């Protein structure tokens, strides 16, 4: 980790750079896989599963028997934990239901919105070094609440052709309709265009590596919607002298163990805390099973000392972290001044892990500075809002002349005429 003291504003841009990925030829590679899946369907997906996931599959779909067996392989303790998390996620996201009210904008003119679930959604759950069954809950639970009729899930199998039982248990619990053994670019392409087995969906959700991210971006150009641009995970801890260095170090490491391209940053007003956190990170790192991954990630990480909370907040809002932990004396007051962040964790007893798993908030969040413009996944991500309007005779009389005037000045005579013929009909009735 890099220790930095009182950096000038001129240094901030360089200071806040995310780890750079080598994307040379990335999109060309991804595009060729997408085109192959689009043309050849299941045959191409099975071929790429053999190539990239090193598994020979006879079919892509997970069978009911596999789901049933998976339930017996998950411990009662983990089942209880997953069920508790599901309940909290359900409670929080159900509270976000949209209730559209009819609004009379003027006499005889009424407008309103109706919320409708996206009919078919696709969820991508990465494989890699950890089974992310928590992400199944974060995506499938709000999809179910939103009223999505078909929830399709793709996740890469292991070399024996099996999916982690906790992923299957969570998927069944959350109401996933269909599960497929497919990972990477081929999974995104299958959901975007459909194959003999995998249904075409209207919107794709879920994290992934740079290939998955590139695939989502390419298919979203014209064929399907996606949740948001995604990149390596990140956390910032904003702390003052009141913070516990043990807690801060644990939070930084919990992010660092995600992957070698993750980023963890401390911004603090206390030089003493900066020094103590550095030592504590080294101590805790030595005890972690995933210490090699975390250590590599920490090369991208920084402990930054600033002069006061005003500067800390300015730097924070410039960085726009995916996760922001505020461990300061008056953390609620500090939180009020945060304008750019994906999800915020307040006080010394609120670790990022809580939001990652079970507090109820969603952990699918904007990274790479996109928190300046994007929100994290919520119930709104799975719905569309359709607008309605109704105009009665008194309404068209009141609003009609204004429409005619505006249409005439935009030289759109047919627009004007659509109102004029109605006004004449009312006059002659």
Predicted regions and their residues:
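A glycine- and small/hydrophobic-rich beta-loop-beta segment
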Residues: 258, 266-341
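Conserved small-residue-rich beta-alpha loop and adjacent elements
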Residues: 103-169
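C-terminal core of ALDH-fold dehydrogenases
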Residues: 318-429
